[in-house]
């Protein structure tokens, strides 16, 4: 009941700056705890850049939240982690530029290289973990459609022509808020409507149904790392 109350509260305040500020103040300990878990050390407001980034990420999650994203605190924790990792990546790139152009002493170069390698390894491990968590969440969401990962292996398009047809359907679905609402809220794909609009045979759409639904869910859900991994292109 507690988490549901938080979800409802965030939905209610997401467009109210004053209420957002109050909510952020209330959850500063939570934000700090999330940050410390990522960086592996104590952080303090006004001293650590990572905590400032976490604060901005938390506000971002409030403004973008809706119930389809699941539990708000879990959602915000994931976003905080991602923003901090993005920050580390940018810092790593900056340090490489300095090493190339700054003519640093050997000892300093070795230190910076060690930091860069450490950040890179940390980022890879974190991304792998986030992808695993996203796959678990996706598995649960697909189960509501009676879709398994095993199904996807069998129905994934193999030929260029088939990929093009599937891509056309997916692009059409994503461009139609009314169809997206039927998928998200009513849990069904309006095959007849797609058939009529695109003049694609009903059998083809039915055959592609599970694949289309899966790609649409990934594109519109909180699956940032799966999207990067799948690298699906809607032509």
UniProtKB/Swiss-Prot annotation:
Regulation: Negatively regulated by the anti-sigma-I factor RsgI7.
Gene coding for it: sigI7
One of the protein's GO biological processes: DNA-templated transcription initiation
Motif (Polymerase core binding): 49-62
Residue ranges flagged as DNA-binding region: 191-210
Keyword terms, alphabetized: Cytoplasm, DNA-binding, Sigma factor, Transcription, Transcription regulation
GO cellular component: cytoplasm
Species name: Acetivibrio thermocellus (strain ATCC 27405 / DSM 1237 / JCM 9322 / NBRC 103400 / NCIMB 10682 / NRRL B-4536 / VPI 7372)
The name this protein goes by in its record: RNA polymerase sigma factor SigI7
Cytoplasm in keyword set: yes
Role, per record: Sigma factors are initiation factors that promote the attachment of RNA polymerase to specific initiation sites and are then released.
Subcellular location: Cytoplasm
The protein's assembly and partners: Interacts with RsgI7.
Pfam families the record matches: Sigma70_r2
Induction: Up-regulated in pretreated yellow poplar (PYP)-grown cells.
GO molecular function per UniProt: DNA binding; sigma factor activity
